[in-house]
Amino acid sequence: MAKPILLSIYLFLIVALFNGCLAQSGGRQQQQFGQCQLNRLDALEPTNRIEAEAGVIESWDPNNQQFQCAGVAVVRRTIEPNGLLLPQYSNAPQLVYIARGRGITGVLFPGCPETFEESQRQSQQGQSREFQQDRHQKIRHFREGDIIAFPAGVAHWSYNDGSNPVVAISLLDTNNNANQLDQNPRNFYLAGNPDDEFRPQGQQEYEQHRRQQQRQQRPGEHGQQQRGLGNNVFSGFDADFLADAFNVDTETARRLQSENDHRRSIVRVEGRQLQVIRPRWSREEQEREERKERERERESESERRQSRRGGRDDNGLEETICTLRLRENIGDPSRADIYTEEAGRISTVNSHTLPVLRWLQLSAERGALYSDALYVPHWNLNAHSVVYALRGRAEVQVVDNFGQTVFDDELREGQLLTIPQNFAVVKRARNEGFEWVSFKTNENAMVSPLAGRTSAIRALPEEVLATAFQIPREDARRLKFNRQESTLVRSRPSRSRSSRSERRAEV
């Protein structure tokens, strides 16, 4: 009788702790004065590259002033077929966009039940009866166009079960209140011997050499000879402690420390595909299940609102944490929120469409501009925007509060551009078109257009426009009503545009 009571108390404490952490993560820390005094923005390429056994990790320098202004860090991972990204957690919440490929991921919420389990007959095939049948927490499928949300401190892993590489762009919101360390992005690995993804390679080699020298200089320290030289969270513990904690022999405990593992953070699964317990779905079945998940989530959200109005608190662990939907596809053209037939489309994901983003305080936008189409001048009301170019090229201009052009250049595939909050921006696709994903530092990032049907100019009275710009009312009326589209428009050929491109090429 005592065990069920203790289990109930434990689950209640886990719920209270986790809900407190999630609630605390709502919001961002105050920026230091002057961090966003940017006179110039740049389209940035990755500055650090790590080649792992089954993939590549590329990161942008988090100390760059643009990332310091936005309070974020960005990493791009390429996972080869049959590649496994080892279990890890980070000090900041993160959004991941799947630019290419498909696979599976597991997210390890503390205290949640292991709802995926193999049958008893299957577990006994080829094994003695003393082994228990395997069970683990839920596994989620992902595909191209998905946004995946990972809360701070929650461990997760990913595996490429397809025939093409998976390319994933991850943004870590280091300025989020959930991060109580410092502004440096930190990944904590549960296995392997990974490199620090945000530290230059030469600096990492120096740090490893320095640690080895320190250990050699202190051979008499208690337990020092039993500690590994790996870089995962088990490496710094005494092997005896680990053996006691897991109730295994010391040799097995030492394997956890991955001292001589040189595969880094993306490893190859040898032989056949990774054997885990999961439903086998076709593409149609997966999309049908996604729709069901969204419907269940809307119903649960409605019930929670009714409960709060009725004065009842929802305290079920499985309802609040374990069944969180962490994924939303914004790459499918049929999912578009804004569509102009000759210009392009935009899809967004925010806390209304993916409620977990309410706690992460992040959202995203996926856009596609057709050849020579224009995303009208606009600004982000309440968020910084980190734009990653997925395909093609675009002319981009960004203007600050002094009316100065801080960026006037081309943004190409694989590059990043940070657009600070309230800075005005315009994008025009080149001949091959332009596709991008924008990570935004607010759960419900809002955009205000400067031209078009829903613009600030359209909302002003004609007389105000005429007086402000010193133009006749007829011209003010044309400013307001000549453009009927809302956001994306088909642009006309411009002689000044071609001459500007020629001047840029000469420079």
From Swiss-Prot:
It comes from the Eukaryota. A motif (NGXEET) lies at residues 315-320. Transmembrane segments: none annotated. Residues 281-315 have a biased composition (Basic and acidic residues). The keyword Disulfide bond applies. GO terms for molecular function: IgE binding; nutrient reservoir activity. Keywords: Allergen, Disulfide bond, IgE-binding protein, Seed storage protein, Signal, Storage protein. Residues 214-228 have a biased composition (Low complexity). InterPro entries: 11S_seedstore_CS (IPR022379), 11S_seedstore_pln (IPR006044), Cupin_1 (IPR006045), RmlC-like_jellyroll (IPR014710), RmlC_Cupin_sf (IPR011051), Seed_Storage-Functional (IPR050253). GO terms for biological process: seed development. Disulfide bonds join C36-C69, C112-C322. Expressed in seeds. Pfam families: Cupin_1. Proteolytically processed from a single precursor to produce an acidic and a basic chain that are linked by a disulfide bond. Seed storage protein. This is 11S globulin seed storage protein Jug r 4. It comes from Juglans regia (English walnut). The lineage of its organism: Eukaryota, Viridiplantae, Streptophyta, Embryophyta, Tracheophyta.
